[in-house]
Every structure is written in C-alpha cells, then in structure tokens.
Regions:
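Conserved, well-structured core segments that form the ligand-binding/active-site neighborhood
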Residues: 1-47
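Flexible, glycine/charged-enriched surface loops at secondary-structure junctions
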Residues: 2-10, 41-48, 79-84, 91-92, ...
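Generic structural hydrophobic/aromatic packing signal, biased to beta-strands
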Residues: 5-7, 32, 51-53, 119-122, ...
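Electropositive phosphate-/nucleotide-binding environments in soluble metabolic enzymes
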Residues: 22-26, 45, 63, 140-143, ...
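Glycine-rich, charged/polar anion/phosphate-binding loops
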Residues: 32-41, 63-69, 105-107
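Short, glycine-rich nucleotide/cofactor-binding loops
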Residues: 53-63
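C-terminal non-catalytic interaction/assembly regions of soluble proteins
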Residues: 66-178
C-alpha cells in the first residue's frame, strides 16, 4: 500500500500554521521543500557579542538551536540557549544519552567551540538532560531565572553590545542548503 497524498505544515515563530502544502507525495514534497527554504531561511548574524537562540518549535530537542547560534558569536562572546521545556529534553534513542555511561549508537555530544566564552542554557523548569548532549565544560551554565541571565550578561558586556536573536533557532537555517 503506497501513499496517495502527503501533507506538510510550515509553522511561524509562535507555533501557528503559516502554510500548508498537500498533494501527491513527490510533487507535494518538492513544493513544501521550496516553501520551507524560503520560510525558514535566516540571515546569519556575524561577530555578535551575545547570541540568544530560542528553541521554541522543538523545545524538547533544544540543543539543535546551537547549530545556528555558535557560528554567529565572536571570540569571547556568550551564547544563551533558551530551552524552556516543561517536560524536559526528549529521549533520543539513536543519538541521546542514557545516564552517565550509556548512549545510542550515534551519540551526539556537541562541543562548545573555543571562541565561545559561556554557553548559558536557560530553562525555567530545571533539568539536567540538556547538558548531556554537550561535552563536559566549565563554560556551560544552567540557569532558571531570566533576570539572573540578563544580569550576568550585563556584568560582562558594556552598553554597546551587539546581540543576535534567533527567535526559533531549532527550525531556522542560515543558507547553504541546496
């Protein structure tokens, strides 16, 4: 039994449906891909003192927002990942960790790049699973109070600070995809 129809929805930064593509699978896929490339394409910020990457659409897989954030920060800059997921991070059975010493066959452990001063992971619902997708580093701070996040950034950065904000970094992309 094959598919005779496929439906894809593109969402906006509030999680609302912004566009729907439907039709025969191959034709619909091509149309949805073309629409998604335009819809989610984002100019890449460069040399920002602070990069704020909100993972909203896939808050339970927040780490994906760092792929847009890390290339945007200048040496010595800070990255803030908003991983505000009340249910915590999803168990990823192929790439995720299971405790301290067991993981999926393709375990993903992202390294905080050398040029990043701090990676602040903000989640008002404290949990430790967010950090398990990252190599251990003293650069990583887990914070649950947004006012304290802002206070820490203000201490480190002066009044003339270049800030890049990705409102939905987990589904945005910065070119380079054919």
């Amino acid at each position: 039994v094959g598919l005779d129809m496929k439906i894809d929805a593109l969402v906006n930064m509030w999680g609302e449906t912004a566009e729907i593509c439907a039709g025969a699978p191959q034709a619909e896929y091509a149309a949805a891909l073309a629409a998604a490339r335009k819809h989610y394409l984002t100019p890449q910020a460069k040399e920002a003192d602070i990069v704020i990457a909100n993972s909203f659409a896939k808050a339970s897989e927040a780490i994906s927002g760092l792929m847009v954030a890390f290339p945007s920060v200048k040496p010595g800059g800070d990255v803030v990942l908003i991983a505000n997921a009340p249910d915590g991070q999803a168990t990823h059975y192929l790439m995720g960790p299971f405790g301290n010493s067991i993981a999926g066959k393709l375990q993903l452990q992202m390294k905080v790049p050398d040029n990043v001063n701090r990676l602040i992971i903000y989640n008002e619902y404290p949990e430790i699973a967010s950090g398990r997708f990252l190599e251990d580093s003293e650069k990583i701070l887990m914070m649950e109070d947004w006012e304290k996040v802002k206070g820490l950034l203000k201490q480190s950065h002066g009044p003339v600070t270049k800030v890049a904000v990705y409102p939905d970094a987990d589904i945005q992309y910065c070119g380079g995809i054919n």
